[in-house]
Amino acid sequence: MQKKNAKKYAGLRDEQFSLVEHYARQHGINSKFLLVFTWIYNNPEGITQEFICKRTYSSKQVIQSIVKNHMRKGWLYLETIPNDKRRKLIRMTELGRKEIASLVEPLNIYEAKAFSALTKEQQKAFLEATQIFTETFKELIESYRVDD
């Protein structure tokens, strides 16, 4: 039964990932860009490249490419951290905030509407179960090592 339920959940999660990818593609980007933009948007005071790499399991090169590309578009800029000149915060310009908001905010609204289809009790149970599942899944994935 557990294996069957795990497979069913994986299918539902995959459908959610595919829906987000579809949404991103409609805006001319992919879900990795959308994920990075979401982190930047939700941290308007600035966020480091290292933090985004850690939270999205992305390489520095991937994040750096996204940031540099969107610096050229005038969406992002880098700000030196006063007490650590080597590290920089990624911040949005006014144009960037407007453009990124047009990507992130509709998705936030859709997620909130989908969540509101659940009762308060279902929401609480869903959040608790998802938190336990995510923490356990993370531990298992992060402990996995490929033999060389």
Regions found by a protein language model. Give the residues of each.
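N-terminal helix-turn-helix DNA-binding core of bacterial DNA-binding proteins
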Residues: 18-62
